[in-house]
Amino acid sequence: MNLIEQLEREEIERLGKIIPDFSPGDTLVVNVNVVEGDRKRTQAFEGVVIAKRNRGLNSSFIVRKISSGEAVERTFQTYSPLIASMEVKRRGAVRRAKLYYLRDRTGKAARIREKLPARRIQQRSVAAD
């Protein structure tokens, strides 16, 4: 590990942000701090993660949502001080790392299947009678 990577890792630890484990296809709610004049408030942005870029301190992700029939995409820096919190609403089952093809789709064609948790098969101990 070189010096730059070490400095970035220390900075990430210093920030102490709680970032949930999410991936492309997941529906994410990002609470963003918005400053309007002298007021500061939190605005929720809920949408599907279409891309994630893992670059240490420079990591980012793109969230896409449909608002009043218009598609809105917003790029967030993962460790930005403007992000108050993040929450994963639902897991999506996708087979691609970048979901840019969703830009060309509308309505039902743009839906993503939900990833269901794997069922655990319980081992039954057979008692000898």
From Swiss-Prot:
GO terms for biological process: translation. It holds the Pfam family Ribosomal_L19. GO terms for cellular component: cytosolic large ribosomal subunit. The keyword Cell membrane does not apply. Keywords: Ribonucleoprotein, Ribosomal protein. GO terms for molecular function: structural constituent of ribosome. It comes from the Bacteria. Disulfide bonds: none annotated. The keyword Ribonucleoprotein applies. Coiled coil: none annotated. This protein is located at the 30S-50S ribosomal subunit interface and may play a role in the structure and function of the aminoacyl-tRNA binding site. NCBIfam families: rplS_bact (TIGR01024). PANTHER family: LARGE RIBOSOMAL SUBUNIT PROTEIN BL19M (PTHR15680:SF9), RIBOSOMAL PROTEIN L19 (PTHR15680). Belongs to the bacterial ribosomal protein bL19 family. This is Large ribosomal subunit protein bL19.
